[in-house]
Amino acid sequence: MEGLTEGRLVHFVMPSHEHRPAIVVRVWDQLSGMVNLVVFTDGSNDVKKSEESYSRDPSPVLTLWETSRSYSEDPQPFTWHWIERA
């Protein structure tokens, strides 16, 4: 896959179908686009916590580690794609 390298910024599709920025930290398969990502979340808006756990740790989860994620031109949950042009 042309242009795929560690450090590239891409979009990851959350289970809610919303897109979040992610950095490619490892390319497993250049041809298929299988990668490891660090995904930047929208804090507690993306990662819900129960009231009990929130009272113990009010810090929202700001990144997610997503391993062995596939490329998809059709944005599907748990896949990544190139960032759309504005």
Task: Give the label of every model feature segment.
Residues 9, 14-53:
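Basic/aromatic-rich interaction segments and small domains that mediate binding to polyanionic partners
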Residues 34-86:
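Intrinsically disordered, low-complexity, charged/polar segments
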Residues 3-4:
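Short, well-ordered loop/turn sites that connect or cap secondary structure elements
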